[in-house]
Amino acid sequence: MGMSYQEYVEVYNAVFRKIKTLGENEDEVRREIKRARDYDLESSVVDKALNYGDFIWVESEKLKGMGWEENKKLRELGLFSEAGRWLLEDRFIFPVKDMLGNVIALIGWYPDDKKYITTPSAYFSKKCLFFGMEMLGMQNRPKVTFIVEGIFDRLMLVALGFPCLAEMGITSSAEKESIYGFFKRVYGIPDNDKVGRRVMNEDEWNLPRGSSYIFWEDSSVKDIDDMFKNYEPESIKDVLLEAVKQKERKIEI
């Protein structure tokens, strides 16, 4: 039996707490990476997340011990360069999954110039997939969803209990929009910048009838990730719960 949506939220809540203790200070992240390597993430709740693969720490030696050179699936996931270099070394890793929960690519995060590295997987297409597709195959699948741009935006909303999918960018597509049919209502939250505002004003995500875009005017808050840096999580949750009671196409919070 697969994980229920509530169990999934609990895992993401543990992941959220872990990541937010780091901030984006490179020295702090480096220390945490060393601690993870030395102590294998002591928290039992985070261990649960590791086991489910919703937030995973992988070292190259562990993968090499799996015989990745001979393993077709690992090669097709694009985990290693042709020279055998582990592409996501010293990064925190988020798996991209299909709606059955199969890992189809990995995204490695670290607060450097690159921020995110996605493995060149044979199974992955950003044009066709959201980050968070595994939610569609869960028990008690939610009847509504939020759509955001970034994977951290999604992580934070799911940690509060809100179902959410991430575009992994700004661009929508017919393939992604076909997923809307799984839900009764969709709430789009593009970033609070020039491009994001255009997405809302011109409906570039083609949200279905009865759905809404959510926005705010505070220019110091660019996205959901920023919102969590400026406000308490429970306050954000309360504001969003009030927002989803409204029926307007554009909802200001």
Regions flagged by a language model, labelled:
Residues 162, 178-210, 219:
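Acidic, divalent-metal-binding catalytic cores of TOPRIM
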Residues 179-183, 222-236:
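Short, surface-exposed amphipathic charged segments that create phosphate/polyanion-binding patches used
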Residues 99, 141-144, 215-219, 231-253:
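A charged alpha-helical hairpin associated with nucleic-acid processing machineries
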Residues 62-185, 199-200:
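Phosphate-handling DNA/RNA-contact segment within nucleic-acid enzymes
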Residues 1-83, 91, 103, 113, ...:
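Non-catalytic accessory segments of DNA primases and related replication-initiation nucleases
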Residues 164-170, 210-222:
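RNase H-like polynucleotidyl transferase catalytic core
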Residues 151, 170, 193-194, 218:
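Short, surface-exposed acidic/glycine-rich loop or hinge patches that mediate macromolecular interfaces
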